[in-house]
Amino acid sequence: MRRWAAAAISVLTVLVSLGTAPAGAQIGGSSSNAPIDITADSAEVINSQCLAIWSGAAEALQGQTRLRANRIKVFSQRRGASCGPTQRLEAEGQVFYVTPTQTARGDNAVYDQGADTIVITGNVIIVQGRNVARGDRLTIRVSTRQATMESNARGRGAGNRVRGVFYPGSGGGMTLGQ
């Protein structure tokens, strides 16, 4: 029972830290006081590695925000013989981050607390209203809400370059964390 409690605390620490970070990193822009509901087909705790793995249609909900992936891994910092605060969260396979106003999808995502970043990779699509942006890699600096979309393709003739379609009257772009 203690192992499951430690795993739950570890995952909650990550999600709450996202919820109390600047708006761009909030798990849904919802209140950090909102309860967090995590479900998956299975959960595994590897105490020797300070690692909790939620596998099979993993989903974390807080308020109106949702993180879905095939697998979510939570890495905690080693503190002597026990595990301390969360340092990294990895979402793998069919990643969706959904808020009331935005949906981002990709193949993988990593939240790195030390680097202050969220990186979504692999066929990234972000939608806000009718506006859509696509690329290979989206990097968000959590504290500043600065974002960079990148592509592996280069040059005008190359396919799969970064692309955005923005509709008039919609603000001309996207606002992270809305």
What are these regions (language model features)?
Residues 1-178:
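Mature-chain termini and adjacent capping regions
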